[in-house]
Each structure stands twice: as structure tokens, then as C-alpha cells.
């Protein structure tokens, strides 16, 4: 059983979803596993663990990152994006219902398959394989018809600062999660099934 001592409480905090920690590791070149000698929270959360909606988003994002970054190497700009995004979510008070949608689409910039919006116009389809909008229906089934393509173009105009201005229903939001996850699976063959519950 877990102790209620201050030390044990700190240890439990280390395992909250998306917690950013600093670790000291005893690296031994002849060992396949290295020993963690010290671990501490780099920046404690002020709201994520205590807000049920933010906590559900963080669980979903942690699961998503586990799939999306499975084969990634060290990447400082990518880490900075993730860290800054988590800090934004922790610090914001309202208007974060679309956070996960914006986060997932922006992450694709760092992974090399952010959608090309140059050819978007009303009535365009969105080709999920080639990551671009087109007035011509592709010769495969991995595309979105104009109605859904227009919602994707909407997400691509969102940022954390302005996303509160865009109103989406729960049904639209859940459909967009499905579309984005399918999009990632097309571009990252190692992307597996998400274990977290739907937001």
C-alpha cells in the first residue's frame, strides 16, 4: 500500500499524466537498464489534477503521445511545444474544450505531415494520405467529403489563443478525434489503438 507520508505523496505526483519531471540516472554502459537515482517534478501543476475535464484531456493526450512518439528521437523543439502546451492548459481558466484537437494537429508539424492548406476552397475534399485539400476526389477511400473537410480547415485556423471563438458540438468534436487519429495512423504505421476513454 502507498504511504501517506510527504515523500510518498511526491512520488504519486510523479505519475500524474503529462507531469514534467527531472531525473538523475546512473548510466552504466554495460547495462541494458539504467537506474534512476533521483526524480522530481520540474513544474508542479496548479489545476490539471484538480479539474476533471482537464484531467480527462491530459489522460487522452498522454495516451496519444505514447502512440505518436513511440519511434521519435530526442527533439528539443518538439519537447518545447509539448511542454508549452501542457503549461498553457494548466494555466488557462476557460475556453479549452478544443485543446486536444489543436494540440494534435499542431503536433503533426513536428512529425512532418501537417496538412497543406494552400489549395483549400469551399467544396474541397481533404486527402488524408497526401495531407492536402483538392477539388478532385482522390482514387482511394482515405479522404473527407467537403462538409468534413471544411471542419478540418477550421481546426487548422485555430490556435490556443483563439480556439474559444470556434464553437463545435460534442458530436463534431468526437468525429474530429476519429478523423485525426485515422490521419495519424495513415502517416505513422506504428500508431496503435488508444487505450484512454473518449473525451
Predicted regions and their residues:
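Non-catalytic alpha-helical scaffolds and adjoining flexible linkers that form interface surfaces
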Residues: 1-199
Amino acid at each position: 500500500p502507498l504511504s501517506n507520508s510527504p515523500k510518498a505523496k511526491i512520488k504519486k505526483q510523479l505519475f500524474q499524466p503529462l507531469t514534467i519531471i527531472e531525473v538523475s540516472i546512473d548510466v552504466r554502459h554495460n547495462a541494458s537498464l539504467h537506474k534512476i537515482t533521483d526524480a522530481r517534478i520540474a513544474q508542479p501543476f496548479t489545476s490539471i489534477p484538480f479539474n476533471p475535464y482537464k484531467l480527462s484531456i491530459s489522460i487522452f493526450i498522454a495516451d496519444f503521445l505514447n502512440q505518436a512518439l513511440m519511434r521519435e528521437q530526442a527533439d528539443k523543439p518538439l519537447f518545447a511545444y509539448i511542454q508549452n502546451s501542457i503549461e498553457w492548459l494548466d494555466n488557462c481558466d476557460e475556453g479549452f474544450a478544443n485543446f486536444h484537437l489543436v494540440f494534435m494537429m499542431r503536433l503533426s508539424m513536428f512529425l512532418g505531415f501537417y496538412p497543406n492548406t494552400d489549395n483549400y476552397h469551399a467544396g474541397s475534399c481533404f486527402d488524408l494520405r497526401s495531407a492536402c485539400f483538392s477539388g478532385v476526389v482522390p482514387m482511394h477511400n482515405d479522404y473527407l467529403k467537403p462538409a468534413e473537410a471544411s471542419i478540418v480547415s477550421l481546426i487548422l485556423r485555430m490556435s490556443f489563443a483563439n480556439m474559444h471563438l470556434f464553437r463545435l458540438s460534442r458530436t463534431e468534436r468526437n468525429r474530429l478525434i476519429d478523423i485525426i487519429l485515422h490521419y495519424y495512423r495513415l502517416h505513422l504505421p506504428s500508431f496503435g489503438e488508444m487505450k484512454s476513454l473518449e473525451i
